[in-house]
């Protein structure tokens, strides 16, 4: 006779995509930082410009203001409370955004340069504008 599996055993068998939780989880090198202005270069929101609100290096994703808006239908939590519809930004892969220069209104890749005082700074390759 075969015994049914416990929920904890089922969880171990089913592989779920997502973040690895152990200490040595993979972190991607992010050239885009929080507060940068970026332009979306592919996908449904192509051409939109926004500020990076948050960076997720372990998932290789960024949260951009006004981009990838998702809708949540919330059930009422307490008696007498009505349900509601919420909209908010969802993260998008960092490969779908490019740093954007507000001065010259052009998107560009990011490079690095050593300044005269020895600091390593991020630079827009098309315009030469320093980001840091």
From Swiss-Prot:
SUPFAM superfamilies per the UniProt record, alphabetical: Translation proteins SH3-like domain (SSF50104)
SMART domains: KOW
GO biological process: translation
The keyword Glycoprotein is annotated on this UniProt entry: no
Pfam families: KOW, ribosomal_L24
Keyword annotations from UniProtKB, A to Z: Ribonucleoprotein, Ribosomal protein, RNA-binding, rRNA-binding
A GO molecular-function descriptor: rRNA binding
GO cellular component: ribonucleoprotein complex; ribosome
Subunit structure: Part of the 50S ribosomal subunit.
Function according to Swiss-Prot or TrEMBL: One of two assembly initiator proteins, it binds directly to the 5'-end of the 23S rRNA, where it nucleates assembly of the 50S subunit. One of the proteins that surrounds the polypeptide exit tunnel on the outside of the subunit.
Family listed: Belongs to the universal ribosomal protein uL24 family.
Matching PANTHER family: MITOCHONDRIAL RIBOSOMAL PROTEIN L24
Protein's recorded name: Large ribosomal subunit protein uL24
């Amino acid at each position: 006779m075969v015994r049914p599996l416990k929920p904890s055993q089922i969880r171990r068998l089913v592989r779920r995509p997502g973040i690895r939780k152990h200490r040595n989880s993979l972190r991607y090198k992010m050239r885009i930082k929080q507060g940068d202005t970026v332009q979306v270069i592919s996908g449904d929101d192509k051409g939109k410009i926004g500020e990076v609100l948050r960076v997720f290096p372990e998932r290789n994703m960024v949260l951009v203001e006004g981009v990838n808006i998702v809708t949540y239908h919330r059930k009422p939590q307490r008696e007498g409370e009505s349900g509601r519809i919420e909209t908010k930004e969802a993260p998008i892969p960092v490969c779908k955004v490019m740093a954007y220069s507000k001065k010259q209104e052009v998107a560009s890749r990011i490079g690095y340069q050593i300044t005269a005082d020895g600091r390593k700074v991020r630079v827009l390759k098309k315009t030469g504008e320093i980001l840091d």
